[in-house]
Amino acid sequence: MSILTVEQIRMARSALGWSFEEFSKECLVSARTLRRIESEGGLDKATPANLKLIRETLEAAGVEFVGGPGDGPGVRLWK
């Protein structure tokens, strides 16, 4: 499992067309917390449990996290 980045979370939420409120309902993490996580440096303040919920929700919605050494972080939609 690759490390999730702020950019990937932003890109995935945007690709799905979800507002913070919609994303919050889907992943059971407060909209305020999601906003904080999506801010620069926000991952440092996120709990492992919240990051797990975010990743699982986005993957269940058809998001694949891509990118590796030499590549920038990205996302791809499968559904």
Positions of PLM-derived features:
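Helix-turn-helix/homeodomain-like alpha-helical modules used for DNA recognition
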Residues: V63-K79
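Short, charge-rich, low-complexity interaction segments located
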Residues: E38-L51
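Residue-level detection of the helix-turn-helix DNA-binding "recognition helix"
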Residues: S14, L28, S39
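Residue-level recognition of specific faces of alpha-helices
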Residues: Q8, T33-R36, G74
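Short alpha-helical DNA-recognition segment
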Residues: S19-R36
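A detector for short, charged/polar N-terminal pre-domain segments
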Residues: M1-L4
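Short basic helix-loop element that most often maps to the first helix and adjoining turn
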Residues: I9-E22
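DNA major-groove recognition helix of helix-turn-helix/homeodomain DNA-binding modules
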Residues: P48-F65
